[in-house]
């Protein structure tokens, strides 16, 4: 085994290692950022809807499912009885 092969083999692995690290960092950032995004969305949705209807903040649930090709945002808001009358009188 020549000395040149030792150096040429390592030079080729550096880009591969860099790419793997970038993929790992991107994956960790996406997982780390998800709860922050969900909390921000939840707070903004809560603020908009609560302008029109009194809400219990504990009754607002926001979920995000990330698929291979599509991400789905699900918002579940439990409205109190009589909320439909509040919408009609506000409009």
Swiss-Prot record:
Record Pfam families: MinE (PF03776)
Alphabetized InterPro entries for the sequence: MinE (IPR005527), MinE_sf (IPR036707)
UniProt cross-references to SUPFAM superfamilies, sorted A to Z: Cell division protein MinE topological specificity domain
Keyword entries, A-Z: Cell cycle, Cell division
Chain coiled-coil ranges: none
Example GO biological process: cell division
Protein family per UniProt: Belongs to the MinE family.
Cited function: Prevents the cell division inhibition by proteins MinC and MinD at internal division sites while permitting inhibition at polar sites. This ensures cell division at the proper site by restricting the formation of a division septum at the midpoint of the long axis of the cell.
NCBIfam families, A to Z: minE (TIGR01215), PRK00296.1 (NF001422)
Name this polypeptide is given: Cell division topological specificity factor
Source species: Bradyrhizobium sp. (strain ORS 278)
């Amino acid at each position: 085994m020549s000395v040149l092969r030792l150096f040429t083999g390592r030079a080729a692995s550096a880009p591969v290692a860099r790419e793997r690290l970038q993929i790992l960092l991107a994956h960790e950032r996406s997982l780390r950022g998800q709860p922050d995004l969900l909390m921000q969305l939840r707070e903004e949705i809560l603020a908009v809807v609560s302008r029109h209807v009194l809400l219990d903040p504990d009754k607002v649930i926001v979920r995000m499912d990330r698929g291979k090709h599509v991400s789905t945002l699900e918002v579940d808001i439990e409205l109190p009885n009589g909320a439909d009358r509040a919408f009609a009188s506000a409009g």
